[in-house]
């Protein structure tokens, strides 16, 4: 199944944080930080401002940092994705 975002929405595959600390302690799900990094897997066509479509700045394959509590979580085929507005993306990792 493919997701095709609309407007200025972006689909990001969440990159999970380590489950084991450097000291070897296994972290339970409740102790882990909410992920803030991911890889862009789909991008919408952009939003309209003053009647003109503005293309998104991110593209498929970009690794990005996003706001901790932004977006809508979606689980498809056992994979976790976030559906974000482009404005929820804080930076592109180069």
From Swiss-Prot:
Domain of life: Bacteria
Keywords of this entry: Chaperone, Cytoplasm
One CC-aspect GO term: cytoplasm
Primary location: cytoplasm
CDD domains: cpn10
Pfam families per UniProt: Cpn10 (PF00166)
Subcellular location: Cytoplasm
Primary role: Together with the chaperonin GroEL, plays an essential role in assisting protein folding. The GroEL-GroES system forms a nano-cage that allows encapsulation of the non-native substrate proteins and provides a physical environment optimized to promote and accelerate protein folding. GroES binds to the apical surface of the GroEL ring, thereby capping the opening of the GroEL channel.
GO molecular function, one term: unfolded protein binding
Protein name per the record: Co-chaperonin GroES
Source species of the chain: Caldanaerobacter subterraneus subsp. tengcongensis (strain DSM 15242 / JCM 11007 / NBRC 100824 / MB4)
PROSITE patterns membership: CHAPERONINS_CPN10
Family: Belongs to the GroES chaperonin family.
Gene transcribed to yield this protein: groES
